[in-house]
């Protein structure tokens, strides 16, 4: 039951949507059952939803599973090992929703950081900063939804990109070009229509498809390249209903070398830090759900 409070002005106030938990639990799991060790490096967030009204309206903590308990559960479950980040989140979600009657759902998210072996060494690694793998699990009653993703994957094409035919007005100074550098930091999230997935294999496949489409599409606009990247994923993976992407256009401007008596045949550029174009889109399977609630808690995507 929802409690209603009435203020001195007669305004009625009720508790709306809410969730709580422990954010960014730093977890490093070393699997050392052989001489060749494996590293899993995660940043895990656990947030619960359910009957927590009394905690908000009366300070009654009878239903409040402490955020410290949620943190401890992450570490305790890691001791048992896990194959993929998504499977780890599914186990956490199952534990909290089945272990506490008043917890009807929640949100569990993780970032996964990669480590590469140093010269194929058994237990020495260097941090791979080329990308971060992401995963979000949302449970609402009996429904489960997973969004996986990749962020910070920086890519560049030194040719094979054009930009022309755009509107011009009195504020337009950008020159048209038929040969430019195209560079971006790929951030992509894709929503599965099932949780029965080989998550590692699909992640590797999606990553490869995104890179292949970026490399092979002769680009007339970053929007076109983005669409081709998303289309390749949707056409290849029936278990994915939609993919959202956010691609900043990392501008590279040709430097004028004429003051120094030199030409510049598209070889010397200034890499601009900001401002930058920001291109975002959703590419989805026709007929699939376009407004899944899991996206309401994933910022930065249209």
UniProtKB/Swiss-Prot annotation:
Q: Which UniProt keywords apply?
A: Oxidoreductase, Purine metabolism
GO term, biological process aspect, one: purine nucleobase metabolic process
* GO MF annotation: an example: urate oxidase activity
Question: Per UniProt, where does urate bind?
Answer: 67-68, 163, 180, 223, 249
Residues spanning the signal sequence: none
Q: In which pathway does it act?
A: Purine metabolism; urate degradation; (S)-allantoin from urate: step 1/3
- The answer to keyword DNA damage applying to this record is no
**Entry keyword annotation includes Iron-sulfur:** no
Q: Which domain of life is it from?
A: Bacteria
Instruction: Enumerate the active-site residues.
Output: 22 (charge relay system), 67 (charge relay system), 251 (charge relay system)
EC number(s) from the headed UniProt entry: 1.7.3.3
Q: What class of enzyme is it?
A: oxidoreductase
Please give the catalytic activity noted in the UniProt record. urate + O2 + H2O = 5-hydroxyisourate + H2O2
Tell me the PROSITE patterns matching this sequence: URICASE
Give the record's subunit note.
Homotetramer.
Provide the function of this protein. Answer: Catalyzes the oxidation of uric acid to 5-hydroxyisourate, which is further processed to form (S)-allantoin.
Protein family according to the UniProt entry: Belongs to the uricase family.
This chain's protein is named Uricase
């Amino acid at each position: 039951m929802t409690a209603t409070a009435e203020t001195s002005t007669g305004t009625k106030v009720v508790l709306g949507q809410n969730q709580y938990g422990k954010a960014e639990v730093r977890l490093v799991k070393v699997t050392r059952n052989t001489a060749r060790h494996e590293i899993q490096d995660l940043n895990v967030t656990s947030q619960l939803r359910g009957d927590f009204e009394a905690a908000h309206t009366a300070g009654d903590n009878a239903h409040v599973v402490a955020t410290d308990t949620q943190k401890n559960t992450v570490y305790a479950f890691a001791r048992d090992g896990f194959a993929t980040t998504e499977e780890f989140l599914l186990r956490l979600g199952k534990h909290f929703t089945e272990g506490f009657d008043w917890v009807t759902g929640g949100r569990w998210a993780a970032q996964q950081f990669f480590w590469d072996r140093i010269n194929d060494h058994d237990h020495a690694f260097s941090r791979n900063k080329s990308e971060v793998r992401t995963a979000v699990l949302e449970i609402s009653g009996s429904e489960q939804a997973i969004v996986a993703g990749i962020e910070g994957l920086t890519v560049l094409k030194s040719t094979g990109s054009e930009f022309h035919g755009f509107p011009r007005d009195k504020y337009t100074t950008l020159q048209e070009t038929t040969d430019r550098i195209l560079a971006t930091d790929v951030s992509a999230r894709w929503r599965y229509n099932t949780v029965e997935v080989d998550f590692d294999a699909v992640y590797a496949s999606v990553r490869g498809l995104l890179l292949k489409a970026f490399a092979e599409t002769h680009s007339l606009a970053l929007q076109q390249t983005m669409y081709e990247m998303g289309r390749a994923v949707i056409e290849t993976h029936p278990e994915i209903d939609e993919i959202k992407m956010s691609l900043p256009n990392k501008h590279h401007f040709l430097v004028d070398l004429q003051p120094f008596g030199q030409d510049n045949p598209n070889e010397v550029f200034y890499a601009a830090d900001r401002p930058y174009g920001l291109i975002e889109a959703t590419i989805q399977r026709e007929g699939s759900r376009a407004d899944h609630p899991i996206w309401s808690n994933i910022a930065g995507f249209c």
